[in-house]
Amino acid sequence: MIDDDKAIMMLEKALEEAQKLLEHTDDFYPFALILHHDSTIKRLEQKCDDDIEESYLMLHDVLIDYVHDHPTTDIVVLVTQTTMPKVIVQEDGIRSSIRIHLEEQSQQTKAIASRYIYVPYQRVTSDIGTPTLHLLNPQAISFPSEFFPKKR
């Protein structure tokens, strides 16, 4: 599988899991999916009492250490529920979003190696009362790597 295909697969897995979680609750604890060179996927989460923001920060730090300790790490996605930044909100004005922080080891030679991918959503209830999530067009913001050490 080529690097782009791996990244898309990880994005799809992360988004699918977040969508399922949000169909059953108003929010969820952040989680990470990690793809290794041998194609194994590891899921991590870090729960800090009832504090979702603190859980995110703790998980972020755990991922930095994890990538350092596991050189076979290929791709990291860190997923959380958040509000979209005003600068990228689309015309519909929807700000509720799933944010996927994507980093790939193969991109570390580039100046901007990481992306936040915001996927806005609307919670919709069907005629029979079943909640579903309607996902809208994603928006991406690029920034320097946080998890992988910079390659030169």
What are these regions, as identified by a protein language model?
Residues 9-14, 22, 55-58, 77-80:
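A short linear-motif detector with a strong N-terminal bias
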Residues 1-44:
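Long, hydrophobic N-terminal alpha-helical segment
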Residues 66-111:
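Terminal interaction module
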Residues 24, 36-37, 60, 68-70, ...:
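Histidine (H) residue identity feature
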Residues 16-21, 46-48, 61-66, 83-88:
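Short secondary-structure capping micro-motifs at structural edges
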Residues 50-72:
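A broadly used, surface-exposed interaction patch
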Residues 92-152:
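Glycine-rich, aromatic-bearing surface loops/beta-hairpins
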Residues 31-33, 40-44, 49-50, 66-67, ...:
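Hydrophobic alpha-helical segments that drive targeting, anchoring, or assembly
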